[in-house]
């Protein structure tokens, strides 16, 4: 009786394994980062984006290998090259990834008038000079685009940003937190595309 149970269990587990193995694994690779931040900081954000995609269930290919491939292909590029796909897509095909992700990280400061405090002081008749109501805001934004390697088409894009007053205690969202926000946005479109291809 126990042997029968073991045999049935083994067959059941084997069938489940075969069923799940039919679902192909989706792999993506992030392109070299772009934006207004220092390269070291941008790289930290790209690593966070990769981590967020991995947590969402996708495989993440070696970014440094992709960068090397792109550089090699750029150096070999000649005037008679077939331009049906650009270098990045060719590199993606060489790496056998399904998607390429471009990550742009921008950081900037801007001055804004604190209208809330100004209106409050006006009501109390203690209005100060306009310059005293100027606040400096720091903003960081991640913008990502997901390109399907097979078709060279943009299938998803999204952005997430955080802004803080520089003189106050609240700090900007961490790279991980901001990356999760933007990846959650684009995963909906990626899942739709995967479902469409499998049907």
Task: Give residue ranges: language-model regions.
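Boundary at the C-terminal end of the N-terminal hydrophobic targeting segment
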Residues: 19-23
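Short, low-complexity, Pro/Ser/Thr/Gly-rich segments in the mature regions of secreted, periplasmic
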Residues: 185-199
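N-terminal segment of the mature soluble domain
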Residues: 25, 31-32, 36-109, 149, ...
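Residues that line or immediately flank small-molecule/substrate-binding pockets and catalytic motifs
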Residues: 17, 104-107, 162
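Outer-membrane beta-barrel translocator domains and adjoining extracellular loop/strand segments
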Residues: 114-119
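Short catalytic/ligand-binding loop motif for oxyanion handling, primarily in non-cytosolic enzymes
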Residues: 109-112, 164-165
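Short secondary-structure boundary motifs at beta->alpha junctions and helix caps
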Residues: 123-188
